[in-house]
């Protein structure tokens, strides 16, 4: 099983459509395996799309890269310049798609399936408690006050304690990206973090920030390819 949905192959359900029930046998237009992560083999949780087009749980792709120490796709082994970006189209569809729990038969919204199987007695009796992959939170040092904290907390920390800072600093998160060198910012590090590193979500997604980040990465990659091509000619 594996989630092979890409941005080209998926179509969002109409907003006015009645939520559809997906049986385990699948739908010819939208096979149920499209919502399964090929790493944990469960319904996707916080789906992330890699550069090669495959979709995984956020924690699964992060843990796979961390444990293997290789920036490659767990499914096709293609090189990955980053962990990917939120598969917002998949996340939207999962909020309107329903499936019967394979163990107890309860009709559950796909976006809530992971929470359901954590408490599903029949699932627990058969497989044991759902085991999430290990904590993948990395640590970093605030470039302004040198305080060590979780990467996920850096943006909130800077907003609370360093909103007015304009000293040129290096972005500590760029160190962890294989295709990025440390960047110095004379302007707002907060804005850089929002655009370049705020890529995951909990209860909601800021689609404007995500779209801006994607556009910026595409433009940066296009410029880099143009420069490399110019240097070789």
Curated annotation (Swiss-Prot):
Residues 1-27 are annotated as: Disordered. One of its GO terms (biological process) is negative regulation of type I interferon production. Keywords: Adaptive immunity, Golgi apparatus, Immunity, Lipoprotein, Membrane, Metal-binding, Myristate, Transferase, Ubl conjugation, Ubl conjugation pathway, Zinc, Zinc-finger. Residues 121-129 are annotated as: Linker region. Autoubiquitinated, leading to its subsequent proteasomal degradation. It is a lipid-anchor. Pfam families: zf-Di19, zf-RING_UBOX, zf_C2HC_14. E3 ubiquitin-protein ligase that mediates ubiquitination and subsequent proteasomal degradation of target proteins, such as RIGI, MAVS/IPS1, IFIH1/MDA5, JAK1 and p53/TP53. Acts as a negative regulator of type I interferon production by mediating ubiquitination of RIGI at 'Lys-181', leading to RIGI degradation. Mediates ubiquitination and subsequent degradation of p53/TP53. Mediates ubiquitination and subsequent degradation of JAK1. Acts as a positive regulator of T-cell activation. This is E3 ubiquitin-protein ligase RNF125. It comes from Mus musculus. The lineage of its organism: Eukaryota, Metazoa, Chordata, Craniata, Vertebrata. The gene is Rnf125.
């Amino acid at each position: 099983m594996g989630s092979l949905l890409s941005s080209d192959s998926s179509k969002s359900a109409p907003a006015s459509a009645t939520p559809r029930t997906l049986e385990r046998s699948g739908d010819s237009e939208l096979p149920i395996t499209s919502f399964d992560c090929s790493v944990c083999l469960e319904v996707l949780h916080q789906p992330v799309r890699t550069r090669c087009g495959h979709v995984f749980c956020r924690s699964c792709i992060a843990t796979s890269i961390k444990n293997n120490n290789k920036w490659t796709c767990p499914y096709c082994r293609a090189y990955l310049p980053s962990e990917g970006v939120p598969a917002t189209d998949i996340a939207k569809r999962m909020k309107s798609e329903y499936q019967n729990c394979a163990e107890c038969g309860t009709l559950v919204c796909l976006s809530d399936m992971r929470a359901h199987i954590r408490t599903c007695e029949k699932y627990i009796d058969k497989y044991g408690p759902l085991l999430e992959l290990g904590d993948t939170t990395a640590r970093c040092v605030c470039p302004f006050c040198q305080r060590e904290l979780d990467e996920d907390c850096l943006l909130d920390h800077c907003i609370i304690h360093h909103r007015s800072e304009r000293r040129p600093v290096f972005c500590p998160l760029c160190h962890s990206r294989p295709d990025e060198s440390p960047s110095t910012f004379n302007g707002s590090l907060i804005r850089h973090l929002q655009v370049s590193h705020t890529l995951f979500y909990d209860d909601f997604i800021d689609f404007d920030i995500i779209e801006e980040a994607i556009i910026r990465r595409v433009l940066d990659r296009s410029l880099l390819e143009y420069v490399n091509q110019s240097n070789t000619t």
